[in-house]
């Protein structure tokens, strides 16, 4: 195979890697945790990944404690956890 062909193949593989969504095997374990409002009494919009529905959903975060399945934006949740 010529060097041009190898470069094209490398470019296509790189593009495929970037565009392929997060698969369940690549998803961080904390994405499987349930929504956890925490122990504080705040009222903050947050998002968590729901592994049963395979989507990011809104919940109310109290402002402290909770767990790592807690995102400020739905886009951040999708980038991290959504397949």
Swiss-Prot record:
Keywords: Disulfide bond, Protease inhibitor, Secreted, Serine protease inhibitor, Signal
A Gene Ontology cellular-component term: extracellular region
Coiled coil: none
Site location (Reactive bond for trypsin): 41-42
Cellular localisation: Secreted
Record has Signal as a keyword: yes
Expression (tissue specificity): Expressed by the venom gland.
KW Glycoprotein (keyword) present: no
Tree of life domain: Eukaryota
Entry-linked PROSITE patterns: BPTI_KUNITZ_1, BPTI_KUNITZ_2
Main subcellular location of this protein, as a coarse class: secreted
Signal peptide annotation: 1-24
Disulfide bond annotation, renumbered to this chain: 31-81, 40-64, 56-77
One family name in Pfam for this protein: Kunitz_BPTI
Domain BPTI/Kunitz inhibitor span(s) in chain numbering: 31-81
MF GO annotations: serine-type endopeptidase inhibitor activity
Protein task: Serine protease inhibitor.
Entry-linked PANTHER family: KUNITZ-TYPE PROTEASE INHIBITOR-RELATED
Family affiliation: Belongs to the venom Kunitz-type family.
Protein name as it appears in the record: Kunitz-type serine protease inhibitor superbin-3
Species this chain originates from: Austrelaps superbus (Lowland copperhead snake)
